[in-house]
Amino acid sequence: MCLVFIVNRQPFGGMKLSAFGGGVKAGGPNYCACLVKITDKPESNTDYKQSYPHAYEEEFAHARDINKLYGEQNAFRYLPLKNMVLRLFPGDSNEEAEMIALATKLCHTPLTISFDPNDDRTTALSSTGCTLKKETLDEFLKTMRSYERIRTCGADIPMEMYEEAARRNKYIATAKPVKNGRVELIHYIKEQSISFEFHRYGSILDVPPVE
């Protein structure tokens, strides 16, 4: 028997090693974003430096109880990742790296930017405030295990990265960075839902704060 639950009231999916993927819970507000490919329009004039902070404050910064049921609290919130690494390749632009750096900073997720010694980005990306590492692909593969999530600017990456990620149970976010913060910031957090009943035998207890 196969049971599939997609419940807005209590979005679910494990934490720690019981969860694999982008940290988005089934039935939650970002569930459908996992099922589609979202890219910027070529003529988009969205300013990511404005969109990202606005999206963080409006959507990602605060816990909330969407359904507000009497006697039951279903808190939904976003948590930062322990750490993340962005692996850059020669075809990736510095602007894409800067977009990702800003997004992780807003989400309080520590970011390391890794690139090949022959593709030195140290000067160009020094203003991001991120940890910068010059390392070959082989050297990078040996360090993948130490990051909670891996980010790239596209899916066209060496197969060795996918193989190492599979061995280490790591998720690689390969979507091309977009300027819309409501979409882009999903890559740099994980969701948590907590259900709590504050009634006993019909009597309502103290209503806990949503935090």
Predicted regions and their residues:
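C-terminal segments
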Residues: 1-211
